[in-house]
Amino acid sequence: MKKFHIVKLGCPKNDADMEIFKGLLQSKGYKYESNPQLANYIFIDTCGFIEEAKKESIETIFEYVSLKDNNKNLKVIPIGCLTQRYFDDILKDIPEIDGLYGVLSPKTIVEKIENGEYFFKRDIPETLYDCKIRAIPDSHYAYVKIGDGCSRNCAFCSIPTFKGKPKSRSIEEINEEVEFLVSKGVKEIILVSQDNTLYGIDNYQKQALPDLLDKLNNIKGKFWIRVMYLHPDFLSEEIIESIHRNEKVLNYFDVPIQHISDKILQSMGRHKKRNELIKLFEKIRKEPSAIRTTLMVGFPGEKAEDFEELVDFVKEIKFERMGSFIFSKEENTKSFTLPEQIDEQIKKQRQNELMTVQSEISKNIMEKYIGETLEVLLEEKEDNVYVGRSYLDAPEIDGNVYIKNFGDKELTFGNFVKVTITGSYEYDLEGEIVE
């Protein structure tokens, strides 16, 4: 029996793709092997977004290629965004690989493997999976890709060049996948795409995310729905209201604004400016909600006063969750040739300062939850402490809830429990089970 191992890099959209890919391979008689040294195939799902991600992908390819020294039957095959973007360069610079696929649907890749065609990409990427077979994730949450591709053309972003235009799956197809996952015990469905506000623009000729959420909310069973990637420029009142009104949809808004200086936003190609963003957050907070944002430091032309404006804004809005990254100069983007590029050391200093400010804000926000009772999804146990997440916490990027006082009970992973918060940290909470 042929055995395969998967290495997932990059964003959660890759997680969704690889669960489909894994399920398809297993349906063809392949066996998943958790130990890469014992595999016949290693598939590396790469990321090509920014320099740091590209470097990680390349280093990972070399790391796994080295395993071939002790396993002559091993084939190492990179796939995904980096390979779509730099297909010919990778072929030339890493001859040790045994195959290379661009951005293709999992179904296409499996067909190529079955036919012995190990090097293939399309000029127009296949960003959506169209298969009902998928593996069940080891965790109690699952990423479901509702669409992919982007037409925003932000000045700093290369993604449209290798992901293409927005494409959406049908509501019926997504509903069927979510029903299947819930029937298998998945307790949190996380909807992902390059920009979820674009969902339905191509196939329904409108923003169809509210219709999708209304449909998914009617699926039987106890589970959460979390919506990621809401571009602020087209985050409409209808979308906000649909998140607020649907009981199973968490009041968690992932809205990456990138910056707040009107000058920098205009240079980035972002349409909503400072005052409009403030109004947007006010609309979201009409109902108790957690807002997560992502900010960029070091964009060309970012003066000290622009950065200070950003810091002051973070202090004013007090985001429940926040991430940041340093501007990366990427080929085939408008920002690649912009003047006034920022020194790398200054970029790092600004990022550190920004995250230090957010750390204190988060600490203060977490303290306010002491005494409150939250619903928590139990996920694991570490050193006699149960670990779970609340509506505040997307997996891997946000915090956790630690449950230390649970009496003599043995709690079940994947269950929802009520937890009274008794303590807090910078990003995490701790509490005890409500009897």
UniProtKB/Swiss-Prot annotation:
Any one GO cellular component localisation term in the record: cytosol
Subcellular location: Cytoplasm
Catalytic activity: L-aspartate(89)-[ribosomal protein uS12]-hydrogen + (sulfur carrier)-SH + AH2 + 2 S-adenosyl-L-methionine = 3-methylsulfanyl-L-aspartate(89)-[ribosomal protein uS12]-hydrogen + (sulfur carrier)-H + 5'-deoxyadenosine + L-methionine + A + S-adenosyl-L-homocysteine + 2 H(+)
Keyword terms, alphabetized: 4Fe-4S, Cytoplasm, Iron, Iron-sulfur, Metal-binding, S-adenosyl-L-methionine, Transferase
Cofactor list: [4Fe-4S] cluster
Keyword Ribosomal protein annotated: no
MF-aspect GO terms: 4 iron, 4 sulfur cluster binding; aspartic acid methylthiotransferase activity; metal ion binding; protein methylthiotransferase activity
Enzyme class of the recorded protein, top EC level: transferase
Keyword Metal-binding applies: yes
Residues the entry annotates as binding [4Fe-4S] cluster 1: 11, 47, 81
EC numbers on record: 2.8.4.4
Signal peptide positions (record): none
Cofactor note text: Binds 2 [4Fe-4S] clusters. One cluster is coordinated with 3 cysteines and an exchangeable S-adenosyl-L-methionine.
Residue ranges of domain TRAM in the record: 367-435
InterPro entries the UniProt entry points to: Elp3/MiaA/NifB-like_rSAM (IPR006638), Methylthiotransferase (IPR005839), Methylthiotransferase_CS (IPR020612), Methylthiotransferase_N (IPR013848), Methylthiotransferase_N_sf (IPR038135), NA-bd_OB-fold (IPR012340), Ribosomal_uS12_MeSTrfase_RimO (IPR005840), rSAM (IPR007197)
Residue span(s) of domain MTTase N-terminal: 2-118
BP terms from Gene Ontology: tRNA modification
Superkingdom of the source species: Bacteria
Domain Radical SAM core stretches: 136-364
Positions that bind [4Fe-4S] cluster 2: 150, 154, 157
Main location: cytoplasm
Role played: Catalyzes the methylthiolation of an aspartic acid residue of ribosomal protein uS12.
Family under the similarity heading: Belongs to the methylthiotransferase family. RimO subfamily.
Annotated protein name in UniProt: Ribosomal protein uS12 methylthiotransferase RimO
Gene transcribed to yield this protein: rimO
